[in-house]
Amino acid sequence: NVRRAAQATADVLAADGATRVVVAHDTRFGGPMFAAAAAETLAANGLTVHLAEGPLPTPVLSFAVRHLGADAGVMLTASHNPPAWNGFKLKGAYGGTATEEVYRAVAARVAQVGPEQLRGDPDGEGRIEPLEAREAYFEALTRLLDLDLLRGLRGVLVHDAMGGAAAGWMAGF
């Protein structure tokens, strides 16, 4: 089903002239495997894919889409839903949730995609590159936050990723 959703996404994006997509996953079961399958399918359709090499918080995916000038983002996550669930979420070029029109087009296309239409291994048309967004994301946070004010606060500032994709992310900030 991930490959069908990725193929449908590639078909819809191709109709709009898209060339670049960011793909990431959270810490749920199968995340790396599902993200790799989506990336392979998208790349096999001629897209350049920036693939996260580990779990990524959804806001970082959204940032990366804008930062890289990508046409879309694919996040393998079920967000706030139970841990046993997973999902295929689309982001627009603006970094936010894809429009209802895009979701409807992808859903309609998924219903039409059969096994013979799935493209798997990249055939040289597209490529998969590692996503490198951490440094740029931290630079953006530095510009947006008043770090002097935060440093001057009394007490302790705590970040609890609760076992999610943000675990370990703030350690380098």
Predicted features and spans:
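Gly/Ser/Thr-enriched, mixed-charge loops and adjacent short helices
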Residues: 1, 86-173
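Gly/Ser/Thr-rich loops at beta-strand to alpha-helix junctions
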Residues: 26-33, 56, 81-82, 162-167
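Short acidic, glycine/serine/threonine-rich loops at helix termini
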Residues: 32-36, 62-65, 84-89, 168-173
